[in-house]
Each structure stands twice: as C-alpha cells, then as structure tokens.
Amino acid sequence: MNENEYDNFDDLDDLLDEDPTKLDEAEPDDVQAKGSVYNDSENKEKNAESKDSDGVQVANESEEDPELKEMMVDLQNEFANLMKNNGNENNVKTEDFNKLISALEEAAKVPHQQMEQGCSSLKSNSTDKGTVNGSNPGFKNIVSNTLDRLKENGNKVDTSLAEETKESQRSGQNNNIDDILSQLLDQMVASGGKESAENQFDLKDGEMDDAITKILDQMTSKEVLYEPMKEMRSEFGVWFQENGENEEHKEKIGTYKRQFNIVDEIVNIYELKDYDELKHKDRVTELLDELEQLGDSPIRSANSPLKHGNEEEELMKMLEIDGNDPNLGNLDKELTDGCKQQ
C-alpha cells in the first residue's frame, strides 16, 4: 500500500468517525434559502393577484357609472319615441341604433391598461383630468349632446305630424266651406291681385269673375257636398216619418218634399259609377240653385247647407252685437276706412 492509498483510507476513516448530527447542520440554511425563494414567489403572486383585483374593482366601478347608464337609457327612449310613428319599415334602423348604443357603452369603459395606470391616482385622490368612475367627461358630453339633439328632433317630428294631421283634415271629406273659401281667397290674392297706386288691393273684372267661378266650382264639388247632402237626405226621411202628417206643416209640405227630392237627386249623381266633375257640374249647380230658391228646410243639421232659422240673427248672436245698435250702420264705413289704412 503506497502513501496515497493510505491517505485516502484515512480520509474515509475520518468521515466514518464524524458525528452524524453534524451532517444535518447545513440543511436548515438550505431549506431557509429555498423557503425564502418560495415565499418571495408566493408574495409576488399575491401582489399580482391584489393588483388584478384592484383593477377589476375599478373596472367594475367604471362599468356601473349610474349617470352614464341613465344617459344611455334616455337616449334609447328618445329614439324609440322618434321612431314609433314611422311604422315597421324602421325596424332595421332601430336594430342599428341599438348596436350603436352597445358600441358607445363599450367605448365608455376604460381599458384595463389605463386602469392599472389610474389606480395610484385614484388612491391618492388626484384631481387631475382623466377618468372618474370609469367614464370620460368628454364622452359624457358627447352622449349628452346627442340626447339633446334627439329630443330636439323629436319635438320637430311632433310639430310636423300635427301640421300633417291638420292638412289631412283639410283635404279630407270633412272640409267645410270656410276652409275652402279661405284657401281659394289666398290663392286669388297670391296670383290674381295687383296693387294700385294707392297701395290698395285691386282686381280686374275678368279676374274677379274667374275667382268667383273657382269658388263656386269648389263649393259644388263632390268633395264638399256629398257628405252633408247624404246626411240631409237621411234626416229628411226621419222628419217625414215623424212630422209628415202634422197639420202645422201642411202648407209647406209640398216645398219640403221638393227639397227632399232635389237632395236625393244630388246624392244619386255623386254616387254614379261614372261620375265626372266636369260632366255633372252643370246639373248639380241647377239643382242647388232651385234648392236655394225654395227657402228654408225643416232640417237643422249642422252640416246642412240649408239650416232652418234666421242666419242673420245667429251671426249677430255669435258676434254679440245688438241688431238695434245705432252704431251698427257705421260698421261698413269703419271697415272700409280700416282697409284703406292697411
């Protein structure tokens, strides 16, 4: 056995003779080091989770902004009110608008990256301009302005619908003579009238005749007279059943029957399948002239062109003017002077 081999055996012998408890002394330091690394990793994970939790909390706050949500609801309601009168053809537009609302809601949310940057400013009660409760003040202004414009357009639509309703009532079968006269006189003034040197409205004889002809043609049209005449014929029938045999009407019963026959003929003309305004106008005009010459009828229909009673007295009552008023005779002169001053 040489010297090197002997030294090796000595080392082995020393190792075997060493106290076994000393072999574990280094282990706590290693475990402590490993535990420190593990704890550091766990702490980092907890810190990351805490940051994520803070971000989610702020994000949730941003998504639950009551003011912005209220604006969105108002915006949808105003759009629904604006579109409700336009029929089913706007269903596609309504869906598109709902998509737009969803897009606006998404745009209002602050991105997650901005949340992480804004957490420190929120915790420190920063007063800098930026995101507050997850919504941008500039974005709120855009939504608010859009809502105001939508309300303004809704008011314009309501006004337009009201005007269209009035216009449809004028153009329908419920036209009254006052509306027809007003429209025709306006047209006459706009197209046929001229101003004289004294700044007074003047019409030539031919122009006046044409204007009167237009008025008469319109007043004798089916559009104006059919419904009143039809109602008058029906009321005549009821009146004859109730009063035809009364002695008090014996003297005028013949006149009333002739009036009934004229009204019945006019209604029958209007109900012809081949009715033509130009073709039957002359006959209707003749019947109306005869009906007027026969005088008052026993029918008190509000739509009847031959209302019973003194129309002059009714007019004075409406105007609250006493027929015996001495100043009434100067009314024409005052009206003439007023027109000249205008």
Curated annotation (Swiss-Prot):
Inducers of expression: By oleic acid (at protein level).
Lipidated positions per record (S-farnesyl cysteine): 339
UniProt region (Disordered), positions on chain: 1-68, 119-141, 321-342
Modification sites for Cysteine methyl ester: 339
The organism's place on the tree of life at top rank: Eukaryota
Annotated S-S bridges: none
Membrane topology: Lipid-anchor
UniProt entry keywords in alphabetical sequence: Cytoplasm, Endoplasmic reticulum, Lipoprotein, Membrane, Methylation, Peroxisome, Peroxisome biogenesis, Phosphoprotein, Prenylation
Gene Ontology BP, a term: protein stabilization
Residue spans of biased composition, Basic and acidic residues class: 41-54, 331-342
Pfam families: Pex19
Record family assignment: Belongs to the peroxin-19 family.
Family annotation (PANTHER family): PEROXISOMAL BIOGENESIS FACTOR 19
Task performed by this protein: Required for proper post-translational import and stabilization of peroxisomal membrane proteins (PMPs). Acts as a cytosolic import receptor for PMPs and delivers them to the docking factor PEX3 at the peroxisomal membrane for subsequent insertion into the membrane. Acts as a chaperone in stabilizing or maintaining PMPs in the lipid bilayer. Directs PEX17, a peripheral component of the peroxisomal matrix protein translocation machinery, to peroxisomes. Stabilizes VPS1, a protein required for peroxisomal fission, at the peroxisomal membrane.
Note, other: Present with 5350 molecules/cell in log phase SD medium.
Protein name: Peroxisomal membrane protein import receptor PEX19
Gene transcribed to yield this protein: PEX19
